[in-house]
């Protein structure tokens, strides 16, 4: 299964999250998931909120259009981004 798939006007992205990183960045593939490093700690939903904000900024959409479908409490997540306005170059190569 691919890390990123298109479903109509949305992208579904399987992620592996690295919390408490030195900076926010899309790292690349990690197995069959896209690895994303974020600076927020995995405490009280801070990492999820920070991840949503980071991805919304990268794809130039409102935070409400970035939804965590699976994996609220773990490092392995599935995210849906509806109507992405921009697709970062380091993500575009993995879309199927």
Swiss-Prot record:
GO cellular component: cytoplasm
Position of the signal peptide: none
Transmembrane stretches, start-end: none
InterPro entries reported in the protein's UniProt record: DUF167, YggU-like_sf
Family matches, as Gene3D superfamilies: YggU-like
Domain of life: Bacteria
Family: Belongs to the UPF0235 family.
Entry-linked HAMAP family: UPF0235
Protein name, entry field: UPF0235 protein ECA3630
Originating species: Pectobacterium atrosepticum (strain SCRI 1043 / ATCC BAA-672) (Erwinia carotovora subsp. atroseptica)
């Amino acid at each position: 299964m691919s890390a990123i798939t298109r479903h109509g006007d949305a992208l579904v992205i399987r992620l592996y999250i690295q919390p408490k990183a030195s900076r926010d960045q899309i790292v690349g593939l990690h197995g069959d998931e896209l690895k994303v490093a974020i600076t927020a700690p995995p405490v009280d939903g801070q990492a999820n909120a920070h991840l949503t904000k980071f991805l919304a900024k990268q794809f130039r959409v409102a935070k409400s259009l970035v939804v965590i479908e699976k994996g609220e409490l773990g490092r392995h997540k599935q995210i849906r981004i509806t109507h992405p306005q921009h697709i970062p170059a380091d993500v575009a190569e993995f879309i199927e």
